[in-house]
């Protein structure tokens, strides 16, 4: 009876997650596009539902909600379904929609879709060869084979996003990095933009006048008399077309310049708004957060370097370790086990909420940046693939943030994976991503004033 009640709770929560994923799909991703394939919407919503269910089961594990055997069953079932979606269903449909957009392959799209899926499976399987991700006990058809490979891709994505976010967040929030933009700078750039637009209009007028003159001459000398008249008309039209071609090239160059000037003007306006915003109370609060995140970024890079150099992986969760150090230093009586459980629950909850929110914001921006009416179905499926792999690998990494007694069932469900490898791999990719982001933002920040000062 308790299993039925537990299952009804899980099914209800999955329906709610599915509905939220459906609404997000309709209201955010596809609000400007026509939905042609409902299977894409269903796959995205199902992936989102089962991804969120894994985080829900982590919270249930800490709070002790549901029976232990029920949690284990739903962990196992949830993991099997999400792997089925990520390894078999989504890659096949991505190949199917890619082939469907190619007219030459339209009649045999099912065959070519299967070939693309088999190609994906080959490279997906070969991905595990260079990495020590599995125990030798596992067979070739075990579920751990799939989890381990999905985990490598997902952890790589997480580390790349985390490394960039750890650097970009303080750069975005701190007023220290803002350029000093005045109204004079904006007016000067706007004047250049207007001058460029005037030049484009005048040259287009010249082109229109030249075409009109050529058309009128063509009507007057419509039927040239004799051989020399024909030669004259041909040479006149050739020289006129050459002039038009040269003017058109000048117009194209000026239009490209006007686009760049417009983007620079918009950037100056955005920077000026950020300067005004930084003077408000909320702006000062985010500026303080920027300093806090910059300290966190330096600490995270330092710890990642230490972990890589000394091949170190923590045995206890960070909360318990931090409380133990504080209690021993102050020499006070404190129930470390009791409070570490509650603080770990809050920490894991914050990690889960920020992970879901941050990923959804990133997916929305990414979708609008590269999507079109033809490619939107393929891109949504790619986003579903990234989202699923991201959440599966989040479970692998969040496991280390939980006290030891709560890790048992997750370890049993995920199998005997080499968990230490994933943490070391995360540190390596995080460090590379963070240092690359620092270099990129430094060069971008250095070039911005030079652009502004350019005549």
Curated annotation (Swiss-Prot):
This is Golgi pH regulator A. It comes from Homo sapiens (Human). Its main location: Golgi. GO terms for biological process: intracellular pH reduction; positive regulation of canonical NF-kappaB signal transduction; protein transport; T cell differentiation. Glycans are attached at residues 180, 243. It catalyses: iodide(out) = iodide(in); chloride(in) = chloride(out); bromide(in) = bromide(out); fluoride(in) = fluoride(out). Belongs to the Golgi pH regulator (TC 1.A.38) family. Voltage-gated channel that enables the transfer of monoatomic anions such as iodide, chloride, bromide and fluoride which may function in counter-ion conductance and participates in Golgi acidification. Plays a role in lymphocyte development, probably by acting as a RABL3 effector in hematopoietic cells. One of its GO terms (cellular component) is Golgi membrane. The chain crosses the membrane at residues 5-25, 46-66, 79-99, 114-134, 150-170, 290-310, 343-363, 378-398, 425-445. It is found in: Golgi apparatus membrane. GO terms for molecular function: voltage-gated monoatomic anion channel activity. Homotrimer. Interacts with RABL3; the interaction stabilizes GPR89A. Coiled coil: none annotated. Ubiquitous. Does not seem to be able to bind GTP. Keywords: Glycoprotein, Golgi apparatus, Ion channel, Ion transport, Membrane, Protein transport, Transmembrane, Transmembrane helix, Transport, Voltage-gated channel. The keyword Membrane applies. It is a multi-pass membrane protein. Pfam families: ABA_GPCR (PF12430), GPHR_N (PF12537).
């Amino acid at each position: 009876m308790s299993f039925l009640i537990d299952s009804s709770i899980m099914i209800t929560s999955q329906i709610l997650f599915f509905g939220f994923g459906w609404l997000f799909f309709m209201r955010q991703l596809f609000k400007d596009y026509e939905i042609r394939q409902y299977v894409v919407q269903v796959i995205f919503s199902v992936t989102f539902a089962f991804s969120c269910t894994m985080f829900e089961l982590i919270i249930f594990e800490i709070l002790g909600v549901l029976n232990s055997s029920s949690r284990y069953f739903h962990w196992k079932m949830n993991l099997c379904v999400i792997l089925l979606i990520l390894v078999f269903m989504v890659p096949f449909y991505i190949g199917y929609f890619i082939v469907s957009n190619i007219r030459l392959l339209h009649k045999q799209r099912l065959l070519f879709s299967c070939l693309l899926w088999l190609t994906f499976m080959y490279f997906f399987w070969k991905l595990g060869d260079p990495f020590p991700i599995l125990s030798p006990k596992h067979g070739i058809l075990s579920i751990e084979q799939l989890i381990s490979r999905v985990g490598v891709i997902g952890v790589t994505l997480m580390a790349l996003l985390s490394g960039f976010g750890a650097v970009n967040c303080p750069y975005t929030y701190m007023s220290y990095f803002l350029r000093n933009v005045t109204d004079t700078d904006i007016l000067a750039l706007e004047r250049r933009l207007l001058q460029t637009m005037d030049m484009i209009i005048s040259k287009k007028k010249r082109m229109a006048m030249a075409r009109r003159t050529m058309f009128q001459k063509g009507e007057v000398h419509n039927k040239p008399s004799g051989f020399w008249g024909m030669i004259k008309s041909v040479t006149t039209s050739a020289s006129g077309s050459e002039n038009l071609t040269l003017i058109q090239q000048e117009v194209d160059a000026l239009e490209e310049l006007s686009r760049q000037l417009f983007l620079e003007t918009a950037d100056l306006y955005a920077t000026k708004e950020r300067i005004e915003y930084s003077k408000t109370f909320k702006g000062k609060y985010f500026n303080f957060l920027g300093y806090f995140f910059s300290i966190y970024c330096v600490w995270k890079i330092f710890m990642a370097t230490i972990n890589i150099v000394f091949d170190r992986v923590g045995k206890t969760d960070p909360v318990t370790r931090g409380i133990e150090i504080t209690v021993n230093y102050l020499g006070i009586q404190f129930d470390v086990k009791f409070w570490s459980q509650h603080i770990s629950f809050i920490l894991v909850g914050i990690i889960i909420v920020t992970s879901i929110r941050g990923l959804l914001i990133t997916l929305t921006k990414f979708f609008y940046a590269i999507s079109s009416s033809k490619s939107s179905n393929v891109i949504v499926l790619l986003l579903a693939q990234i989202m699923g792999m991201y959440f599966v690998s989040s479970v692998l990494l969040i496991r280390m943030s939980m006290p030891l007694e709560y890790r048992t069932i997750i370890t049993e469900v995920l199998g005997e994976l080499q968990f230490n490898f994933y943490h070391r791999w995360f540190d390596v990719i995080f460090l590379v991503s963070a240092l690359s982001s620092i270099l990129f933002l430094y060069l971008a920040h250095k070039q911005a004033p030079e652009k502004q000062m350019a005549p």
